[in-house]
Amino acid sequence: MGSDDLSTGDKIQKGFQINYMILRDADTGKVIWQENKDFSAPDLEHEARVPVKILDMRAVSREINFSTIEAMENFRLDQKVLFKGRIMEEWFFEMGFVGANTTNTWQSTIEAAPESQMMPAKVLNGNVTIQTSFYDNETLITKSVVRLYYI
């Protein structure tokens, strides 16, 4: 199978990788979690161990550093937070055009749910997954699942 036989999504996926992710307190800029791992691999469930204090923050700034071989016209992601498989929250982020053969850093701010909707860490621990679908326009590039553990 030559490269001409690959779908657009498959071509982008082959040359796409996450280099690292950083979560910061959006108010102070202080790093609360960092992982130098490619969370974009679709065939396994990833794990992240994040400090429990993240649940008390008003907002979190997420920084994703990624590399791509293929250009993307409208890079975006859909992110679902699931508790025991049921959707609790869903967010949509759009970055836009990404050039070929580039490494990019994308920062987004995620605001916490109202305190009345928050559950304790001991209930959430190991029961929350974040499902992130990466797209170029409507073409799915990859889908990542990360299970959260609070430490």
From Swiss-Prot:
Gene3D superfamilies: GMP phosphodiesterase, delta subunit. It holds the Pfam family GMP_PDE_delta. It is found in: Nucleus; Cytoplasm. One of its GO terms (cellular component) is cytoplasm. Its main location: nucleus. InterPro entries: Ig_E-set, PDED_dom, PDED_dom_sf, Rhodop-sen_GMP-Pdiesterase_dsu. The keyword Cell inner membrane does not apply. The keyword Lyase does not apply. Interacts with Pde6. Belongs to the PDE6D/unc-119 family. This is Probable cGMP 3',5'-cyclic phosphodiesterase subunit delta. It comes from Drosophila grimshawi. The gene is PrBP.
